[in-house]
UniProtKB/Swiss-Prot annotation:
It holds the Pfam family MFS_1. This is Probable transporter MCH1. Belongs to the major facilitator superfamily. One of its GO terms (molecular function) is transmembrane transporter activity. The modification Phosphoserine is found at S255. InterPro entries: MFS, MFS_trans_sf. Probable transporter. Does not act in the transport of monocarboxylic acids across the plasma membrane. The gene is MCH1. It comes from Saccharomyces cerevisiae (strain ATCC 204508 / S288c). Keywords: Glycoprotein, Membrane, Phosphoprotein, Transmembrane, Transmembrane helix, Transport, Vacuole.
Amino acid sequence: MPLSKVEHYLSYHTRLLLPHVLSLQSSHRVAYIFSLLSAVSTGFITLISLYSQPWQKHLNYSSWQINTIASMTNLGMYLTPPILGMIADSHGPITLSLLAIIGFIPSYSYLAYVFNHPELSLGGNGDSSFNLSIICFVFIGISTSALYFSALLTCTKLYPHTKLLSISLPTTCYGISSVVGSQLLRIKWFWSSNASSSSSNSDLNLGRVFQTFALVYVVIGLLAWIATSVVSLLHFNEEQDNQKRLDDQTDVEQSPLLERSNHVQEKFTQTMLRIFSDPVTYILAVSILLSLGPLEMFIANMGSLTNLLVQLDAPTLSTKLLSTYALSSTFTRLLTGIVADFFAKKKISIKWILLTFLSLGVCAQLFLLKMTSSASPWGLVPTGSLVGIVYGGLFTVYPTLVLLVWGERSFGTVYGSLLIAPAIGSMIFCMLYAKFYDSRCMSGGGDLRNPSCISAVYKYSSIAFVVSAVLSAVVFWKLKSRKLRI
């Protein structure tokens, strides 16, 4: 298929310039490095867990408002992959890099302006300011998925024959990004003393943070544009070669090709209808909702939970907790991929990996329940590490399971559709957390009460993980009855 008009115009000047500046091999390498840098920046969205305390102190946001922001961000991230995949297939990954630029830069610029002008949130226009902030975070969520898919597709198209370069490294870079971001925010320039407080503790200055992110994405957007233009150049050259070969063929030879193409498209449509009428698809979706929903809740409310348990020096502990979580998640993604390949060679079912991570998820929720019930912060960082292990493991096992059950051709559509489940799960559990936090954990004077006020949330999340494990077992039982060896 030739370049679409959109892809043609977006990549036109870069395609003309690149062959005069770099060789084809050098273009490959530069584009790949730029794509990895893009992937490293996509996980900055996870830093939202560090924004809770500054929002509460500086803009008087309630936990409900903060969790609304987190939920809408996740909806933007998880509801759009099927659409973004269709756009990328039709117009190339360069369109996704453009969407990311359009979404990130104005959104972060506006959020910085709102934080630097708290009167917008505290005055009569507070609702409109907050609503616009929600819209900005929806765009940031969409842009995060767009930039990540842009980087992933570019790596896949540049090195399609090696999973390490095409899948593992960009995925790992996404995991590392929250570590990079949390370390970046340790720089003193991002912190400022609260003049209205007698405490010597400093607060994160989100105005400076968001301004910095806007500038970072200007640079990253340019690098992503160059990287995706290389993919368009390769596609353009490939189409020219194919056209030359087609010109040498007769019309008689071309006719069966068209018939075969129509047959393949019809078969693909039938496969999609069969998949989305299969009960296993929906049982798996509910299992994903009940497991990833509580994990997204923990990530979004890491800062407020730390503040409940510790209160003194909570921002420092929140940063440490996020770094520990991110490192554990990144390491687990790599290790799970290696173990899954080993299991496949030894013909061991992947269900043991999935059920192990779900069991660890139950343990993590029970640890959080114990900590909040006893009002003891001991073990918070190790528990955060355990949550990172479960999160990274599940986000590696679930796509692997989809690939094994429904095949490579249907993978993008099926897995992209299943990502709606964690978006809904995140919204449900984040709103549950916010409801308990605002109604039980805040006194009339705005002071925090005993951490046990939030413990009921982790009872529900523990039950959710148990039900998720049971549903996963049902999925494997149904697949086994169909004689599918996974």
